[in-house]
């Protein structure tokens, strides 16, 4: 990450040093259609996927416990934006952003007892004997899908010789889907096999407002920064299933009329020409309150063992991106 950031900074410095006359950021008098395509390497954050507890029962006095976390890797995301500008009267634009990534891991445990937490802990299933004794082999899979769709009115305003401000206001729809699965077995008589799955589905709709500041450094190069804020209302649902030794447990949770927020931020370097722009940048989204479900519980493993709490309720997640894109304009200034 540090290398990519240094590269972007170096490009900006070199271009600034080679500057010609500063260009006004495009926008106030442009009339016509435009299309923007964006691709990104996106890292989801805040998922806090605790899939199991590892217990070392060789020392009954201290009984060390360790939460095991699934590490969600970065994946690709993309967005498309289509709009029409009426010049000084402003314009309309529609934007769709999507992130879809699957991860998996397989592990063999030769020392610790493994108690999976995907179902929610023993306060949910009342079965403290559901676990894997060493040696045990298990697989964890994760699927994350997030989408936003925006319909915005915008208006571009001159703020100086080099500055323009693009004011944005409109509507936003957002959705988040997550699947987490634990499946394992051991070779002893303790447990034949365990499979736990959890599905989270959250949808919301609301309003959005923001601004994009453009600063022209040279005739064909400038910087852009964007901040936007959305307030949304929606629902979150959770469905978990456990199959252990032929016994099936199922749990459904639903949260209605939740209020959440999405904050967008972005900083990019832009190379501009009359018909198109090229850019690279760093940005992301922070989702607060969306989704909002209970994915953990207080855990009591067996009589006499210490109790620990799990509270990974997805109350704040994020998507951080290094991205690049192109904008085409089909009208005239």
Name each model feature, range by range:
Residues 24-99:
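Short glycine/proline- and aromatic-enriched beta-strand/turn motifs that initiate or cap beta-hairpins
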Residues 39-45, 96-102, 171-177, 229-235, ...:
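Transmembrane beta-strands of outer-membrane beta-barrel pores
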Residues 34, 273, 316-333:
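Outer-membrane beta-barrel "beta-signal"
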Residues 33-37, 90-94, 165-171, 207-209, ...:
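Transmembrane beta-strands of outer-membrane beta-barrel proteins
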Residues 81-85, 154-156, 212-214, 268-272, ...:
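Transmembrane beta-barrel domains of outer membrane proteins
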Residues 30, 87-89, 158-162, 216-220, ...:
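Outer-membrane beta-barrel channels and translocator barrels
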Residues 47-73, 100-146, 175-204, 233-262, ...:
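Extracellular/periplasm-exposed beta-strand and loop segments of Gram-negative cell-envelope proteins
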Residues 32, 75-79, 146-150, 164-166, ...:
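Transmembrane beta-barrel architecture of outer-membrane proteins
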């Amino acid at each position: 990450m540090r290398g990519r950031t240094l590269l972007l900074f170096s490009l900006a410095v070199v271009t600034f040093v080679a500057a010609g006359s500063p260009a006004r950021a495009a926008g106030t008098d442009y009339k016509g259609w435009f299309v923007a395509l964006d691709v990104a390497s996106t890292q989801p954050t805040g998922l806090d996927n605790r899939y199991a507890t590892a217990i070392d029962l060789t020392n009954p006095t201290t009984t060390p416990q360790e939460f095991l976390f699934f590490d969600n890797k970065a994946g690709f995301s993309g967005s498309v934006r289509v709009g029409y500008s009426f010049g000084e009267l402003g314009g309309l634009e529609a934007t769709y952003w999507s992130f879809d990534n699957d991860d998996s891991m397989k592990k063999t445990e030769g020392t610790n007892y493994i108690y999976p937490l995907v179902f929610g802990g023993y306060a949910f299933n009342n079965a403290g004997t559901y676990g894997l004794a060493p040696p045990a082999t298990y697989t964890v899979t994760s699927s994350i899908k997030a989408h936003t769709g925006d319909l915005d009115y915008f208006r571009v305003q001159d703020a100086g010789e080099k500055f323009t401000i693009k004011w944005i206001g409109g509507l936003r729809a957002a959705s988040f889907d997550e699947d987490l699965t634990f499946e394992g077995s051991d070779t002893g008589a303790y447990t034949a096999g365990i499979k736990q799955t959890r599905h989270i589905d959250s949808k919301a709709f609301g309003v959005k407002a923001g601004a994009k500041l453009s600063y022209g450094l040279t005739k064909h190069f400038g910087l852009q920064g964007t901040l936007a804020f959305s307030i949304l209302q929606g629902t979150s649902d959770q469905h978990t299933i456990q199959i252990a030794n032929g016994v099936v447990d199922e749990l459904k949770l639903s949260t209605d009329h939740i209020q959440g927020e999405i904050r967008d931020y972005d900083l990019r370097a832009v190379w501009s020409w009359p018909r198109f722009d090229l850019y690279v940048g760093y940005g992301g989204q922070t989702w607060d309150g969306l989704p909002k479900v209970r994915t953990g519980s207080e855990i009591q493993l067996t009589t006499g063992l210490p109790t620990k709490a799990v509270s990974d309720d997805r109350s704040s997640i994020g998507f951080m991106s290094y991205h690049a894109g192109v904008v085409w304009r089909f009208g005239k200034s």
